[in-house]
Design a protein with these regions (language model features):
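Helix-start (N-cap) detector for alpha-helical repeat units in TPR-like alpha-solenoids
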Residues: 21-22, 55-56, 89-90, 123-124, ...
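Bacterial Sec-dependent N-terminal signal peptides
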Residues: 1-27
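Structural marker of alpha-solenoid helical repeat scaffolds
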Residues: 50, 84, 118, 152, ...
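Canonical tetratricopeptide repeat
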Residues: 60-63, 67, 94, 128-131, ...
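Terminal, low-structured helical/coil segments at or just beyond the last alpha-helical repeat
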Residues: 17, 23, 195, 199-236
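Alpha-helical segment of the N-proximal tetratricopeptide repeat
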Residues: 22-56, 60-63, 67, 97
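Structural signature of tandem alpha-helical TPR/SEL1-like repeats
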Residues: 34-42, 68-80, 102-114, 135-148, ...
């Protein structure tokens, strides 16, 4: 009897020392912040061993896999999170991001639409959906999403730049030039923006002097695609 009590006491001690589900999850998040993604995944798997219904652990594991560029595995993990609980925008948004990286733009838009329906206050959804719509060449819808982003933050240089690309695709060089000017004012190191600005000024408006100045700026910033334009059109 004493021996049995001894083993019961030992087991109780072991169980009391075992980390809880929340402690394991929190450690996984800490490892994520430290960019130790594989170790984080191991902790999220331990959470799921304790509780296979933990939707947050599936979502967090998916984020860690995404950071490792394991997009298919990330999509699988986000899908499991959604299957457990479809009331949060996060796994839909995150799965959309994985589809975006895979250039599966249509699937990305569907997930972003669902995420947006669950929480319309998340500006990142509009920006990333704009990128996916740009990839689908749905330029007017992309412009709408980038405008929503810019209403909240007019100084978002990437939103200005991608709006310009959508405007060019939508055959609006006037609007594109305005957005590109806004871009280079906000980010003077964006060689691609100077390049697009220069090309548009020259090809759409015949502004050779201004266009060449911007193409040369793009080249100076290391944007090599500008070289052929500078060589062909900007030599004195």
């Amino acid at each position: 009897m004493k021996k049995n009590l001894f083993w019961i006491a030992i087991l109780a001690f072991v169980w009391s020392c075992s980390p809880s589900e929340q402690e394991l999850f929190d450690e996984g998040l800490r490892l994520m912040e430290a960019e130790e993604y594989q170790k984080a995944i191991e902790y999220f798997d331990r959470v799921l061993e304790k509780n296979p219904e933990n939707t947050s652990a599936y979502n967090a594991k998916g984020v860690a896999l995404f950071q490792q560029t394991k997009y298919d595995a990330a999509i699988s993990s986000f899908t499991k999170s959604i299957e457990k609980d479809s009331s949060s925008y996060k796994p839909f948004f995150n799965r959309g991001n994985a589809y975006l990286e895979k250039k599966a733009f249509r699937e990305a838009v569907l997930d972003y639409n669902t995420a947006n329906g669950l929480d319309q206050s998340q500006i990142d959804i509009y920006y990333n959906r704009g990128l996916a719509l740009l990839g689908l060449e749905q330029y007017e819808d992309a412009i709408f999403d980038f405008d929503v982003v810019l209403q909240g933050n007019p100084d978002n240089s990437l939103a200005q730049f991608n709006k310009a690309k959508a405007q060019l695709g939508n055959n609006d060089p006037v609007g594109a030039v305005e957005s590109l000017f806004n871009t280079v004012i906000l980010d003077k190191r964006n060689g691609a923006a100077y390049y697009l600005l220069g090309v548009t000024q020259m090809s759409a408006f015949g502004q050779k002097e201004d266009g060449c100045a911007n193409l040369k700026m793009a080249l100076n910033l290391g944007f090599r695609e500008a070289k052929s334009w500078v060589d062909d059109f900007c030599q004195e």
